[in-house]
């Protein structure tokens, strides 16, 4: 379960960094660039959710096998 917690923590840190990047860009960039950053953040979040799901499934499989 520590692997799952680690990945979850990484996701939160990554999302926090992306949010800060969006805040920084709001003051300097055009709305089109901000929208692009928001789309990238969504993609990163989706990939992290997918990795979390796969890791969770692997954790359950390992626990059920008893390795």
From Swiss-Prot:
InterPro entries: HssA/B-related (IPR008455). Signal peptide: none annotated. Residues 22-33 have a biased composition (Low complexity). It comes from the Eukaryota. Residues 18-37 are annotated as: Disordered. Belongs to the UPF0519 family. This is UPF0519 protein C. The lineage of its organism: Eukaryota, Amoebozoa, Evosea, Eumycetozoa, Dictyostelia.
């Amino acid at each position: 379960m520590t692997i799952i917690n680690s990945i979850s923590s990484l996701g939160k840190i990554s999302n926090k960094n992306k949010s800060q990047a969006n805040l920084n860009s709001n003051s300097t960039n055009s709305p089109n660039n901000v929208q692009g950053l928001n789309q990238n953040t969504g993609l990163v979040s989706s990939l992290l959710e997918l990795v979390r799901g796969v890791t969770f499934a692997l954790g359950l499989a390992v626990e059920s096998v008893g390795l």
